[in-house]
């Protein structure tokens, strides 16, 4: 297989782009580095395209390795033909290779292998040839052997039938046809093990769906229901047509002696050997497809959550709500430093609302708090009521935001949190984290395992290694798109920077603590174990504010500094002119980009990036995202009525719709059919996590805590 050609066709890009990307990946370059600094080489393939290419490259190389192993194994057995070798080499999937290898794979002891040991292969061949005019009972007599354990003609014929059944099952073409037929025309069904038992799976108690139309979230729901022993799940294949197909291939002569036996063998081969295997394969295929879809959605949700704009310049009060143990508060200044921590008890069972308000007033006055970040966990509704009442009583203009506290408890009990806040308890750490994730979501959320952030579906049922790899890639891409301040970034944030390992991240922080702030990017080369390759990969993503070189505040790579300086000089500027907001309008002065790029010795795409950075250094792509909805009043679910139009924030996205926070402590669901007047294939085509949207209330069920919303306002 020509892997480069295959990738070119799959990704629908030029062959030279794939060749360049593969070469760069093989040389040890990271995806963010290739995407940002090797645009000319790859034709500006983005990070998503490069990750897809990398994953497929690994799969196809593994496939080629497997083919080589299979060919070698069959050759050692002395059974390799040119035709078989060509078929294996042409196989496009691991399943196709497995089908071709099946007859030659070393087998565990089966009914067929035991029959062969008893010397019944000859009788099986007689039946398969379909030429005999002698009754099978008579043919079988010569295969009787007390020594081999064949006592009767019935045992001999049964053994021969087992051999034929396995040979039919091992036929690659048959399996391919049956698999495709079942995928195209089969159904997946589920039944309740106990219909009287109430469960979240009631939708699937009498469920049937064509395999070809099976939605990923339904597959994952069936898998979970089956694992919890609530459902029985089956694949229903077009059996009559499949048996007819097999008989037409196996029974080639109308022989009254062998045909009835072969009909019986075909049924046995299909029901006992082929059907269970095909069912497993199809269930696995559906699960893989569902998991990939769910991981893709999870990744998109995570990216959008990480890329939410920071709220800079405000002192924030982080509020971790609780009942019995009290609400933990943390005052965090605009730099993320914790100024104070307090515990108040406005909720049951203590209900010390008056005392809590007095404490809050003092904190707001003392630290000039302008924003409260309230976690959405237990007791958040009661806490919000206290906040709203307080805001009406004080002269200061303070607003609040309800933030997801998913993962905050995981972080607060972690080794990292203990190192960061050694004198705080878990509640105080959690409150600080809740405040910081509003100030800078990216910097705070990277400290938490992406799987704990709570924007996925069925994440605990998936292949955890694959999920971790995919989500790690999303975090890496997000961190590198934004870039980090080399002098303030934490080790967990630095870990995600291109080319920086966990060890290097710790070494950078240790070096910074021992030697003071970095004044120049080149100082990175003094960090233990950070060599030229790591420097090349990471330098452009690490910013130095107020350093020796103004270009260090930009994402211009040091390898392009000479070109950037030549450009500045030719336009009558110096590097110092970048300081204080950049060179507005510089892009208009570069009138002949192709000629200018040639003169500077860089590509046009690199020149464009340099100009963009000089025009607006340290620009933050998150600034273009919708900002959180700041609130000063509260709604109750009972206040909602159909037809009411509200502003809300998209909190999570699933295959079937989006959950929107409208400020009533219960996210409402906008079903995919209610997102637009036009047909929508997937919610991600319309919305993303963090989007602020106008929604209309369709229905409210207070008892079941369900709110149905629509984005179709007309």
Where are these regions (language model features)?
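Short beta-alpha connecting loops at secondary-structure transitions
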Residues: 18, 341-348, 371, 413-426, ...
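Accessory alpha-helical DNA-binding modules that contact the DNA backbone or grooves
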Residues: 30-31, 42, 46-147, 481-624, ...
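Duplex nucleic acid-engaging cores and interfaces of nucleic-acid transaction enzymes
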Residues: 49-51, 59, 63-318, 322-412, ...
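Long, charge-rich intrinsically disordered scaffolds of nucleic-acid metabolism proteins
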Residues: 96, 401, 407, 412-482, ...
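Low-complexity, acidic/Ser/Thr- and charged residue-rich accessory regions of DNA metabolism proteins
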Residues: 139-153, 207-208, 245-270, 274, ...
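A glycine-rich phosphate-binding loop feature that marks nucleotide/adenosyl-phosphate handling sites
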Residues: 179-188, 319-323, 377-379, 403-410, ...
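Long, charged amphipathic helices and adjacent flexible linkers at domain junctions
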Residues: 281-299, 452-483, 598-642
């Amino acid at each position: 297989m020509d892997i480069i050609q295959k990738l070119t066709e799959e990704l629908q890009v030029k062959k030279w782009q794939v060749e360049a990307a593969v070469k760069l990946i093989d040389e040890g370059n990271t995806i963010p580095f290739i995407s940002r600094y090797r645009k000319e080489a790859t034709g500006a393939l983005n990070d998503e395209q490069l990750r897809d290419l990398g994953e497929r490259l690994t799969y196809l190389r593994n496939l080629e390795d497997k083919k080589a192993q299979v060919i070698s194994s069959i050759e050692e057995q002395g059974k390799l033909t040119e035709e078989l070798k060509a078929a294996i080499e042409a196989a496009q999937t691991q399943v196709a290779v497995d089908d071709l290898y099946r007859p030659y794979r070393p087998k565990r002891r089966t009914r067929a292998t035991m029959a062969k040991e008893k010397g019944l292969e000859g009788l099986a061949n007689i039946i398969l040839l379909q030429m005999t005019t002698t009754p099978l009972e008579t043919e079988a007599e010569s295969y009787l052997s007390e020594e081999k354990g064949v006592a009767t003609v019935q045992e001999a014929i049964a053994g021969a039938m087992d051999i034929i059944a396995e040979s039919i099952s091992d036929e690659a073409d048959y399996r391919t046809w049956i698999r495709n037929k079942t995928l195209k025309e089969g159904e997946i069904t589920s039944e309740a093990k106990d219909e009287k038992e109430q469960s979240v799976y009631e939708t699937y108690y009498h469920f049937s769906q064509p395999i070809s139309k099976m939605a990923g979230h339904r597959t994952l729901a069936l898998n979970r229901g089956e694992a919890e022993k609530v459902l029985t799940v089956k694949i229903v294949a077009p059996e009559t047509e499949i048996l007819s197909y097999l008989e037409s291939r196996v029974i080639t002569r109308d022989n009254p002696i062998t045909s009835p036996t072969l009909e019986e063998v075909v049924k046995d081969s299909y029901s006992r050997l082929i059907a269970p295997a095909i069912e497993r394969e199809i269930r696995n295929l559906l699960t893989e497809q569902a998991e990939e879809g769910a991981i893709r959605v999870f990744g998109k949700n995570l990216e959008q959550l990480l890329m939410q704009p920071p709220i800079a310049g405000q002192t924030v009060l982080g509020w971790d709500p609780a009942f019995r143990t009290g609400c933990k508060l943390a005052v965090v200044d605009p730099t993320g430093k914790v100024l104070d921590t307090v515990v108040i008890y406005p909720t049951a069972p203590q209900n010390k609302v008056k005392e809590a308000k007095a404490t809050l007033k003092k904190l707001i006055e003392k630290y000039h708090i302008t924003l409260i970040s309230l976690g959405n966990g237990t007791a958040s509704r009661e806490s919000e009521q206290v906040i709203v009442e307080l805001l009406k009583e004080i002269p200061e203009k303070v607003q609040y935001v309800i933030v997801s506290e998913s993962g905050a408890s995981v972080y607060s009990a972690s080794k990292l949190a203990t190192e960061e806040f050694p004198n705080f308890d878990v509640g105080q750490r959690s409150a600080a984290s809740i405040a910081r994730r509003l100030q800078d979501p990216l910097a705070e959320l990277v400290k938490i395992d992406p799987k704990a952030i709570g924007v996925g579906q069925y994440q605990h049922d998936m292949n955890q290694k694959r999920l971790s790899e995919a989500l790690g890639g999303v975090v890496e891409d997000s961190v590198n798109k934004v870039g980090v301040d080399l002098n303030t970034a934490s080790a967990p944030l630095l870990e995600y920077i291109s080319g920086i390992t966990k060890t290097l991240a710790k070494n950078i922080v240790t070096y910074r603590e021992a030697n003071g702030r970095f004044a120049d990017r080149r100082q990175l080369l003094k960090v233990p174990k950070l060599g030229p390759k790591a420097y090349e990969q990471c330098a452009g993503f690490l910013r130095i504010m107020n350093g020796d070189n103004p270009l260090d505040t930009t994402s211009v790579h040091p390898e392009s500094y000479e070109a950037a300086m030549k450009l500045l000089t030719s336009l009558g500027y110096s590097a110092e002119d970048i300081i204080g907001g950049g060179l507005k309008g510089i892009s208009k002065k570069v009138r002949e980009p192709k000629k200018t790029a040639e003169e500077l010795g860089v590509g046009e795409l690199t020149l464009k990036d340099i100009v963009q950075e000089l025009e607006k250094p340290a620009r933050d792509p998150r600034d273009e995202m919708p900002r959180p909805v700041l609130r000063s009043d509260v709604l109750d679910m009972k206040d909602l009525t159909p037809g009411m139009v509200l502003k809300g924030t998209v909190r999570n996205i699933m295959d079937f719709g989006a959950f929107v926070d409208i400020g009533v402590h219960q996210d409402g669901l906008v079903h995919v059919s209610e997102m637009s007047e036009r047909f929508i294939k997937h919610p991600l085509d319309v919305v993303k996590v963090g989007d602020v949207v106008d929604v209309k209330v369709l229905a409210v069920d207070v008892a079941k805590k369900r709110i149905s919303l629509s984005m179709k306002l007309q």
